[in-house]
Amino acid sequence: MKSKLKLHGFNNLTKTLSFNIYDICYAETPQDQQAYVEYINSVYDAERLTRILTDVVDIIGANILNIARQDYDPQGASVTILISEQPVTPTESQIEESPGPLPETILAHLDKSHITVHTYPEIHPVDGIATFRVDIDVSTCGVISPLKALNYLIHKFESDIVTVDYRVRGFTRDVEGKKHFIDHEINSIQNYLSEDTRNGYQMTDVNVYQENLFHTKMLLKQFELDNYLFGDATSNLSPEQREQVTAKVKHEMLEIFYGRNVAV
């Protein structure tokens, strides 16, 4: 077993895991499209996103400093959680009998370690293809690894397409003064995914090892059209229409996966 690296002082490495998670569906009528946006806004509102991120904090073994969250009109939500590696000791101002901070001041002492999430519901103006995007950033400073949150987040959002970026920045020193620009072995983000996740997705890596930069794209392998239909489309489509919608949805997924417009 490899021995732990002895450090001089605090571990100053910053590890950041960034997700772009996409969920695709087809909503045939304008009424269904509006209903889809309202559904997403209710299912993934700021309160539920806070619960999900709180679970992430527990998974990576961190401690919550502060939470700020917001639902947006007409659509979308965001949550920011500041975290620390060590348990937080209450300050005198926190335990004395005095008014607490105003909402506007809650993020005044921004910490290096944080988790953020933003949601972006979107609908094609003509084709009825609806895309729900979730952007998540987990940034930690010290020995805490954000990679522990991978499987949980991918499954929690029932992801069709996922792009994941992981980078390590800064350096820390050992007791002899030697710099270390990464404190763990990693060849691919895929190594941190469970077997069922790896089997369920088509995956592509683009890694720049010398820069401690790792990138993985994921596309769900199994396609069942009924899982992508919303509203009237779940029962009103003819076999020919189902075939057309299947082509539209798959085309949308491929464009997002490859990150460019693809000719039909």
UniProtKB/Swiss-Prot annotation:
Binds 1 pyruvoyl group covalently per subunit. Is synthesized initially as an inactive proenzyme. Formation of the active enzyme involves a self-maturation process in which the active site pyruvoyl group is generated from an internal serine residue via an autocatalytic post-translational modification. Two non-identical subunits are generated from the proenzyme in this reaction, and the pyruvate is formed at the N-terminus of the alpha chain, which is derived from the carboxyl end of the proenzyme. The modification Pyruvic acid (Ser) is found at S113. Pathway: Amine and polyamine biosynthesis; S-adenosylmethioninamine biosynthesis; S-adenosylmethioninamine from S-adenosyl-L-methionine: step 1/1. Heterooctamer of four alpha and four beta chains arranged as a tetramer of alpha/beta heterodimers. Belongs to the prokaryotic AdoMetDC family. Type 2 subfamily. This is S-adenosylmethionine decarboxylase proenzyme. It comes from Pseudomonas syringae pv. syringae (strain B728a). The gene is speD.
